[in-house]
């Protein structure tokens, strides 16, 4: 049996003790595909505030992307060109009074 790999992510309520824990355990075998078992644990209590506080989610996905993929994503972002501002000071209009 190969290396044991564990991944963890969780979400929790800010004002309560509601917690969701996701974890995956993989057991890679030499010369075989990785087998993954995923578990979800939900402990819910009375909710008073529906505000979510995210912690540790998407961390594994970000690290699995290659630098080439990230550079391509940045290159494809839309750009906004700002108009050039005049170096001169504001133009004064003559007063009619």
Swiss-Prot record:
Protein family: Belongs to the geminiviridae protein AC4/C4 family.
GO biological process: symbiont-mediated suppression of host innate immune response
Name of the protein this chain belongs to: Protein C4
Primary location: host cell
Entry GO terms, CC: host cell plasma membrane; membrane
Lipid-linked residues (N-myristoyl glycine): 2
Protein location: Host cell membrane
Coiled coil region boundaries: none
Function, as annotated: Pathogenicity determinant. May act as a suppressor of RNA-mediated gene silencing, also known as post-transcriptional gene silencing (PTGS), a mechanism of plant viral defense that limits the accumulation of viral RNAs.
InterPro entries: Gemini_C4 (IPR002488)
Topology in membrane: Lipid-anchor
Pfam family, one: Gemini_C4
Entry annotated with the keyword Transmembrane helix: no
Polar residues: bias regions: 77-88
Keyword set, alphabetical order: Host cell membrane, Host membrane, Host-virus interaction, Inhibition of host innate immune response by virus, Lipoprotein, Membrane, Myristate, Suppressor of RNA silencing, Viral immunoevasion
Region (Disordered): 1-31, 75-97
């Amino acid at each position: 049996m190969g290396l044991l790999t564990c991944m963890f992510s969780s979400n929790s309520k800010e004002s309560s003790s509601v917690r969701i824990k996701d974890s995956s355990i993989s057991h890679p075998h030499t010369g075989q595909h990785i087998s993954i078992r995923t578990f979800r644990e939900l402990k819910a209590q009375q909710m008073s505030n529906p505000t979510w506080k995210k912690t540790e989610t998407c961390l594994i996905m970000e690290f699995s992307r290659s630098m080439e993929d990230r550079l391509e994503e940045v290159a494809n972002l839309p750009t906004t060109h700002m108009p050039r501002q005049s170096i001169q000071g504001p133009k004064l209009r003559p007063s009619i009074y």
